[in-house]
């Protein structure tokens, strides 16, 4: 049974091009499920019944797992059984008509532009090359709206300050080129010219942002850095995701259209961008209609100033 799980994870990597973080999440969710099923002595995946699935979901509920966690694990299990059915490893799919718990989507609140400005100035109070590094990281994260996983995955070769552009590899290995201008470009240039060489121990790591050992900074490392600055501002709930959300909200408030923000964030669907930015459903529908029928009349109906 474990072998088929490994084959499924390999399929997600090779065939679907999912990122390492996503694969790791699938493994975490499905490992627990596999252990549960093995203990029930079902013998093979073809013997797993709907009752087994319901028993697992009840187990998670009794263990007081968050509804969002249960919903995510249900989705992973469904994907796994769809794969098994496609491979003819099972004849019937026990996850058909299996309902996932409804999850309320709690999005982080956007901080104000003034709060962003305060945050971006704080690294200047940190002495040494780390201050310039932190300044560059925060500036780039807010200026581009990229995910923190994308930020720490950047290599020096992804930056082209001559044309003010950063190459970013997003979900499903989709590449997008993001503009980097103004204070973000200046901060990044200063970091590269002055600080990075001081932080780098052997000069061999291609990573753009380095930790104190000269190695690639991790997501957890960035989180600790951000948390330290956020607490100094009294913003204890600030997360990297909050900065991404603030970027999108502020872009719309400045008159950027929904499609442009969608492309910058790397969203496959505009509905995701609509949820991210608290844009009304009616506004998104109007934009879709205008995009499908690009007439002057329709374009005039779409209002993007907030």
From Swiss-Prot:
Domain annotation Tyr recombinase: ranges: 106-289
GO molecular function, one term: DNA binding
UniProt keyword Nucleotide-binding present: no
Keywords recorded for this protein, A-Z: Cell cycle, Cell division, Chromosome partition, Cytoplasm, DNA integration, DNA recombination, DNA-binding
InterPro entries: CB (IPR044068), DNA_brk_join_enz (IPR011010), Integrase-like_cat_sf (IPR013762), Integrase_catalytic (IPR002104), Integrase_recombinase_N (IPR010998), Integrase_SAM-like_N (IPR004107), Tyrosine_recombinase_XerC/XerD (IPR023009), Tyrosine_recombinase_XerCD (IPR050090)
Active site positions, chain numbering: 147, 171, 241, 244, 267, 276
Subcellular location: Cytoplasm
Pfam families attached to this UniProt entry: Phage_int_SAM_1 (PF02899), Phage_integrase (PF00589)
GO biological process: cell division; chromosome segregation; DNA transposition
Ranges for domain Core-binding (CB): 1-85
General function of this protein: Site-specific tyrosine recombinase, which acts by catalyzing the cutting and rejoining of the recombining DNA molecules. The XerC-XerD complex is essential to convert dimers of the bacterial chromosome into monomers to permit their segregation at cell division. It also contributes to the segregational stability of plasmids.
Subunit structure: Forms a cyclic heterotetrameric complex composed of two molecules of XerC and two molecules of XerD.
Family assignment from sequence similarity: Belongs to the 'phage' integrase family. XerC subfamily.
Protein name: Tyrosine recombinase XerC
Source organism of this protein record: Herpetosiphon aurantiacus (strain ATCC 23779 / DSM 785 / 114-95)
């Amino acid at each position: 049974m474990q072998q088929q799980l490994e084959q499924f994870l390999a399929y997600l990597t090779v065939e679907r091009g999912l990122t390492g973080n996503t694969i790791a999440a699938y493994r975490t969710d499905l490992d627990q499920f596999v252990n549960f099923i093995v203990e029930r002595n079902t013998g093979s995946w073809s013997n797993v019944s709907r009752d087994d699935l319901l028993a697992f979901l009840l187990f998670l509920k009794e263990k007081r797992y968050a509804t969002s966690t249960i919903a995510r694990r249900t989705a992973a299990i469904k994907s796994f059984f769809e794969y098994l059915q496609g491979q003819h490893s099972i004849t019937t799919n026990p996850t058909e008509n299996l309902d996932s718990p409804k999850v309320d989507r709690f999005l982080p609140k956007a901080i104000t532009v003034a709060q962003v400005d305060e945050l971006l100035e704080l690294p200047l109070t940190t002495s040494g090359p780390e201050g310039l590094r932190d300044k560059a990281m925060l500036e780039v994260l807010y200026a581009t709206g990229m995910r923190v996983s994308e930020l720490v995955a950047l290599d020096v070769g992804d930056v082209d300050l001559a044309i003010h552009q950063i190459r970013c590899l997003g979900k499903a290995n989709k590449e997008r080129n993001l503009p980097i201008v103004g204070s973000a470009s200046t901060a990044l240039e200063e970091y590269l010219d002055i600080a990075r060489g001081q932080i780098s121990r052997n000069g061999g790591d291609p990573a753009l942002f380095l930790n104190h050992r000269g190695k690639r900074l991790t997501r957890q490392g960035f989180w600790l850095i951000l948390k330290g600055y956020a607490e100094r501002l009294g913003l204890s709930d600030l997360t990297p995701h909050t900065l991404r959300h603030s970027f999108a909200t502020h872009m719309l408030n400045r008159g950027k259209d929904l499609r442009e923000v969608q492309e910058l964030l790397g969203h496959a669907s505009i509905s995701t961008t609509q949820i991210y930015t608290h844009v009304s459903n009616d506004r998104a529908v109007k934009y879709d209609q205008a995009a499908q029928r690009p007439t002057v009349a329709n374009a005039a109906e779409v209002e993007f100033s907030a």
